[in-house]
Amino acid sequence: HPLVPDDFLIRAIGDPQRRDELAFLDLAGLRSRDVLKRYGATDLLYSLGTAHPGAVTLHNHPRFMQQLRRDDGMVVDLAAIDILRSRERGVPRYNEFRRLLRLPEARSFEDLTHNSQAAAELAAVYDSIEDVDLTVGLHAEPPPPGFGFGDTAFRIFILMASRRLKSDRFFTSDFTPKTYTPEGIRWIAENDMSSVLVRHYPDLGPALHTVHNAFAPWPVLPDPATEH
């Protein structure tokens, strides 16, 4: 997934000079416990909180997912497998998907990407704009200003996100003091992700005291040695 980086920068909240770089496979699976013991939860949370996700765009699929070595030694390309699975399941191609949403289809590769190099690369792979796979088309779409991904994916995201919330009784009909207790409702009203993190990991306080949304990248704390 383009959001997942290949490499991670591990920071120390109490030592701005310490910066270690780890590849995804260095901290994935069974290796994760050793990484947690080595750096501790506070520094790992700080490192992940200050990191930025990858852009949802072409040429940004993680390298390790394209050359993933399984436990049996077989190397697989998950990017190619995703395309193959979509085709096997009958997922509509990009233009047909747009039409099913009552949206105008792309008339050409240039119309899809607004990028001449990307359009040429797509033309080298696909015989027609109608052949472009949905995932490829979604990654090729230029996002509107201020958006993290293109118009087509955003429309589906809005539908799915709102449906998940509206279909969960604990967010709707049972979001009441009777279900959560008055004390529970007070905790919900007076806390957010930042306060939850700081309550369990107090050393994160300096990194989060100005953060209004802990799910967005946090600011990196300045190095006192370089401040004047």
Each PLM stretch: what is its role?
Residues 1-228:
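Terminal regions of secretory-pathway proteins
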